């Protein structure tokens, strides 16, 4: 069954409480302070000093725990935010209103000979903020983001200027995204911001990158379980562990030292640092 907000048969139902995908601030002030766990749960910090690990905020003993298997992860995740995060027995189900869905995977193998493995998180997004590049067309972006052409056409009728150089990225470089082949279509002006509803998943590769809407093959993610999660060189997140529903704007992960993190993440471009206050004001104005 194809979801109304996606042209892909693999799209999963949304609750309506999903965040908008944006590169900022996660790819700027949060790039070296927030990992995949923080990003998926929406717990932004611009000064976190240690890697966030499920259960660590509650001082749960690791007991030689490795992230090559899923053992013990559910207990640790639920302990971090009791009453605000719930394990979903059916990963295909819709999250309840006010909640959004995340998925956890682990890496039994990697290219480094690492014996402890690693975890990785993905989060369902409800809309996208994207900056056009040379060659973009209405039809091409519709295929890339798995939406109807009318959705892109409507967004193209109300484009805006990017607020920062990185505003509108969906990968480290938008030109590296694997784009579906299309015939010549309606050309779009490069360097403009489009905002439109979508049903895709995003993730963040630890402290090494900003948020991504693409998998290891450069393709946008409709269902993380069907995406390429084998990074080379890197970890191979081949084992699906569980899906969770997360109360939006109510959770914290790891050693979150940013007092405004939970509030700010609900409007992702409101960067919570002094030198970005002007950017935040512009974003608020652009949404009116």
Language-model-derived ranges and their functions:
Residues 118-121, 161-166:
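Secretory-pathway/luminal and periplasmic proteins that interact with or process carbohydrate-rich
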Residues 128-159, 167-178:
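Primarily a LysM-type cell-wall glycan-binding module
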Residues 63-128, 190, 195-208:
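...with weaker cross-activation on analogous glycine-rich loops/strands in unrelated enzymes
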Residues 14, 25-35, 96-106, 222, ...:
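Ubiquitin-like/PB1-type beta-grasp interaction modules and other compact soluble beta-rich domains
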Residues 164-196:
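Small/polar beta-strand repeat architecture
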Residues 187-288:
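Active-site or metal-binding loop neighborhoods of secreted/extracellular toxin and effector enzymes
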Residues 2-84:
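Cysteine-nucleophile protease catalytic domains, especially the papain-like/related folds used
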Residues 28-32, 114, 133, 144-147:
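Extracytoplasmic/periplasmic, Sec-exported soluble proteins
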């Amino acid at each position: 069954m194809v979801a109304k907000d996606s042209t892909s048969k693999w799209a999963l139902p949304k609750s309506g409480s999903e965040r908008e995908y944006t590169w900022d601030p996660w790819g700027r002030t949060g790039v070296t302070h927030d990992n995949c766990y923080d990003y998926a749960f929406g717990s932004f910090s611009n000064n976190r000093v240690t890697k966030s690990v499920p259960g660590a905020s509650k001082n749960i003993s690791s007991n030689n725990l490795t992230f090559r298997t899923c053992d013990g992860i559910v207990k640790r995740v639920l302990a971090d935010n009791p009453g605000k995060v719930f394990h979903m027995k059916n990963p295909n189900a819709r999250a309840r209103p006010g909640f959004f869905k995340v998925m956890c995977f682990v890496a039994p193998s990697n290219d480094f000979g690492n014996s402890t493995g690693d975890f990785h998180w993905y989060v369902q997004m409800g809309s996208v903020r994207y900056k056009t590049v040379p060659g973009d067309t209405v039809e091409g972006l519709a295929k890339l983001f798995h939406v109807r052409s009318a959705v892109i056409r409507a967004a193209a009728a109300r484009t805006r200027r990017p607020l920062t150089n990185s505003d509108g990225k969906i990968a480290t470089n938008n030109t590296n995204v694997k784009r579906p082949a299309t015939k010549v279509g309606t050309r779009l002006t490069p360097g403009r911001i489009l905002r439109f509803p979508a049903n895709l998943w995003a993730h963040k590769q630890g402290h090494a990158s900003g948020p991504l809407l693409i998998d290891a093959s450069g393709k946008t993610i409709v269902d993380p379980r069907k995406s390429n999660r084998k990074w080379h060189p890197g970890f191979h997140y081949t084992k699906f562990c569980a899906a969770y529903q997360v109360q939006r704007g109510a959770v914290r992960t790891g050693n979150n030292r940013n007092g405004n993190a939970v509030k700010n993440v609900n409007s992702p471009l409101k960067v919570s640092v002094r030198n970005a206050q002007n950017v935040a004001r512009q974003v608020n104005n652009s949404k009116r």
